[in-house]
Each structure stands twice: as C-alpha cells, then as structure tokens.
Amino acid sequence: MKKTVLVIVALVVAFGIYVRVAPFDLATWHTDPIEAPEKRKGGYKSTLVLESSNAQSALEQVVSVAAEWPRTRVLFGSPAEGRVSFVTRTRIWGFPDVTTVSAVAEGQSVTLTFYARQRFGGDDHGVNRGRVSAWIAQLQDQSSTSK
C-alpha cells in the first residue's frame, strides 16, 4: 500500500514538472491567428479594430497589456514581426495557455486578431475567452482615452 501511494505521488510530481518544462514547438504554437479555426474546444478567437495605421505600435500596446497580466510572458515573436505569442500559466499547476496576436494595417486602421488555446486538457472553462476579452477591453479603454 505504501509503495502504491509513493508511486502515485511520484507520478503527480512528475506530471507537475512536465507541464512546466515541456518545450513549445514554434511551428505548432506561433501560427497565424487569422488562419486559426473559429471554433476549438478550449480555444477562443476574436478581433479588434483600432484606429491606427501602425501595426507594430498596435502590437506594442498588446505586449504592454499582456505584461501586466499575471504569469504571462512573450513566448515567440515580436511587434516588429507582426505577430506575438504569449504563454500564460495557471496559478497552482502552471498549466500553459498560449495566446497569439497578429496585427494587420489597412488604411487608417489596424486589425488585431487574437487566438488563445490551452496546451493540455479538453476544456479551459472560459479562461481563454476571459483573458482575451479583458485584454481587448483594456486596449479599447486605452484607445478611447488617447483620442
């Protein structure tokens, strides 16, 4: 019995370590959010149009907003590239969610496309939608106060 408990504890600890150190593949996670599926279980896709002609500047705003979000960091890309992928981890287990944002300038506006999805599990219980919605709300607030 004691041996079984130790094996179970070891497996739980190993899984906890794995979700924190497992590498991310650039080709899998830093994909174009415009081409991402509209519906994916545990995923969320949304767009925001800003009055700006500078895609890089718009993505710099996104990076600034994401930097304020707990346990979030840039995973791949940069505003200069036109696409940035962020990883946000859950508080206790450190499960990663990836949010990729692209910016496309068209005339005097920039369309930001957000695509958030979890790496492990089947359902994120609306966490990705909540995060993207909060980022969009903050960007809209910044946009309206800068006018």
Please describe what each predicted stretch is.
Residues T4-V7, F15-K147:
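Ser/Thr-rich, low-complexity intrinsically disordered terminal regions
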